[in-house]
């Protein structure tokens, strides 16, 4: 349970950073951190964000992963997401 609380805290901090620094317009948490019944000790934080300039994406990934050395953040630019991933996000995602 503490790991889930930590993961969600990282997700919220990452969303704040992405909005303030990279001008993200929409950020959605998906995957096991958004679905507590699927969460386990090896879960990471899956985020999809729109509005991040593609030239700043690598820096954004580094910054969100620097928030917590124990918790990996998988960041996807919404503009580059596959239709299949977008369907998963629409079904199980939670806006931040």
Describe the function of each predicted region.
Residues 1-26, 34-41, 50-96:
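Catalytic core of pol beta-like nucleotidyltransferases
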